[in-house]
């Protein structure tokens, strides 16, 4: 099934009333465009991949190791409008962080050290993860990003920005304070992006409106979300100039998931660790990613599993980049067979045959994202630990995924 797509022409002063600013509720209704319509590309380092995605040569070396040389539906649909400078609204379950980061990296002027892109997210963890994604994808371009989430003074923020931060990532309240306090100069910002836009607009509507008032009139907008309420969609349109609107159907995104899903009944929380160790011994899992819901649980479970004699690493929003890189390298090299992580999103470089939900995510979309982590169409298994308190959420997840998750069979070792 093709995504629903409506589009726009490139902004110009003539089209927006003479001053380049058409961010109001009277925006012209979008006109239909074809997904594979060819647009003239004058930049020499832009190449096409599978006829629908544009990735710069400078990014190719890095993205090939992350399966972006085989773009997903969401990558194909989102990156092209971003690279062409168009406003975009995209609703999809997977890939939004990578899509928006690729688009930003190809729109930056690397001769300038001014802040040129502003990305807002609802949580501190997602801000740090987005910073990490830009750092990894943009390492050959010398792109510099920083997460601004509070805990720093206006002077400290200014000092960080003065080092040449080209992409500022942050939470709405703190970023608005930076703009009001003149710690962040908006004059050179050319892209304004919301990830998890539905949640951001629902919880920080006034702050978003305040931030937009500081932006240059020709700023490109990109709003991305796994879900999009009618109210949020109308708010997006209010601020944009004839946006490209992309809705990737859920059934299309689910087609690439080739993972067998099971659950394990656990009497109480204290029994989970023994169940987990039993799985390791029974299944002889070479590598597994274990998902928990909080940083504290990630830290405590890491120590408990390590105490059982297993090699384990952990990544979450509370660790520094160097420690995160070390944990990923250990897992990729095989020196650590277990990786414990929280609800982090971004570049999926971690391939593992098993995903284990030690804590069941409270949001179905988080479950789906984790199920497809590291698979890219490859076979795998996902196992959820279910206590009596998880039953309602577990039922919601099954309905959302349109699947019946079965109890883990005794011959589980044959599944890998």
Curated annotation (Swiss-Prot):
Catalytic activity reported: ATP + H2O = ADP + phosphate + H(+)
GO biological process: cytoplasmic translational initiation
Chain residue ranges for the region called Disordered: 1-36
GO MF entries: ATP binding; ATP hydrolysis activity; RNA binding; RNA helicase activity; translation initiation factor activity
EC number: 3.6.4.13
SMART domains assigned: DEXDc, HELICc
Gene3D superfamilies the record matches: P-loop containing nucleotide triphosphate hydrolases (3.40.50.300)
Main location: cytoplasm
Motif (Q motif) on chain: 48-76
Keyword ATP-binding attached: yes
PROSITE patterns to which the protein is assigned, alphabetical: DEAD_ATP_HELICASE, HELICASE_ATP_BIND_1, HELICASE_CTER
Keywords carried by this UniProt record: ATP-binding, Cytoplasm, Helicase, Hydrolase, Initiation factor, Nucleotide-binding, Protein biosynthesis, RNA-binding
Cell location: Cytoplasm
Helicase C-terminal domain: residues covered: 258-416
Family: Belongs to the DEAD box helicase family. eIF4A subfamily.
Record remark: domains: The Q motif is unique to and characteristic of the DEAD box family of RNA helicases and controls ATP binding and hydrolysis.
General function of this protein: ATP-dependent RNA helicase which is a subunit of the eIF4F complex involved in cap recognition and is required for mRNA binding to ribosome. In the current model of translation initiation, eIF4A unwinds RNA secondary structures in the 5'-UTR of mRNAs which is necessary to allow efficient binding of the small ribosomal subunit, and subsequent scanning for the initiator codon.
Protein name (database record): Putative eukaryotic initiation factor 4A-2
């Amino acid at each position: 099934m093709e995504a629903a797509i409506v589009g726009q022409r490139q902004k110009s002063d003539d089209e927006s009333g003479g001053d380049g600013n058409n961010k109001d509720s009277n925006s012209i209704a979008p006109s239909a465009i074809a997904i594979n319509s060819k647009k003239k590309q004058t930049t020499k380092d832009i190449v096409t991949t599978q006829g629908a995605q544009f990735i710069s040569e400078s990014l190719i070396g890095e993205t090939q190791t992350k399966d972006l040389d085989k773009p997903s539906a969401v990558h194909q649909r989102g990156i092209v409008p971003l690279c062409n400078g168009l406003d975009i609204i995209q609703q999809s379950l997977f890939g939004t962080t990578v899509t928006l980061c690729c688009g930003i990296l190809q729109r930056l002027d690397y001769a300038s050290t001014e802040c040129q892109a502003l990305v807002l997210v609802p949580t501190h963890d997602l801000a740090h993860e987005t910073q990490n994604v830009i750092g990894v994808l943009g390492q050959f371009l010398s792109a510099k990003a920083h997460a601004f989430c509070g805990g720093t003074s206006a002077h400290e923020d200014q000092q960080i920005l003065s080092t040449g931060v080209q992409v500022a990532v942050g939470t709405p309240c703190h970023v608005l304070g930076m703009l009001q306090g003149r710690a962040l100069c908006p004059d050179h910002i050319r892209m304004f992006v919301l990830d998890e836009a539905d949640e951001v607009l629902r919880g920080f509507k006034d702050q978003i409106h305040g931030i937009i008032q500081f932006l240059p009139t020709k700023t490109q907008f990109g709003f991305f979300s796994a879900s999009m309420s009618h109210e949020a969609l109308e708010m997006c349109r209010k601020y944009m100039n004839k946006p490209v609107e992309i809705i990737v159907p859920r059934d299309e995104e689910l087609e690439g998931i080739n993972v067998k899903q099971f659950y394990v009944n656990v009497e109480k929380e204290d029994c989970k660790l023994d169940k987990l160790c039993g799985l390791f011994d029974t299944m002889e899992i070479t590598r597994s990613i274990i998902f928990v819901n909080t940083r504290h649980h990630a830290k405590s479970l890491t120590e408990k599993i390590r105490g059982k004699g297993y090699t384990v690493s952990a990544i979450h929003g509370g660790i520094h980049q160097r420690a995160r890189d070390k944990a990923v390298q250990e897992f990729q090299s095989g020196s650590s067979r277990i990786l414990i992580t929280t609800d982090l999103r971004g570049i999926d470089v971690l391939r593992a045959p098993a995903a284990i939900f030690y804590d069941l995510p409270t949001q179905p979309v988080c479950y789906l994202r984790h199920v497809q982590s590291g698979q890219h169409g490859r076979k795998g298994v996902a196992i959820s630990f279910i206590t009596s308190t998880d039953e309602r959420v577990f039922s919601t997840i099954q309905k959302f995924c349109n699947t019946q998750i079965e109890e883990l069979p005794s011959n589980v070792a044959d599944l890998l």
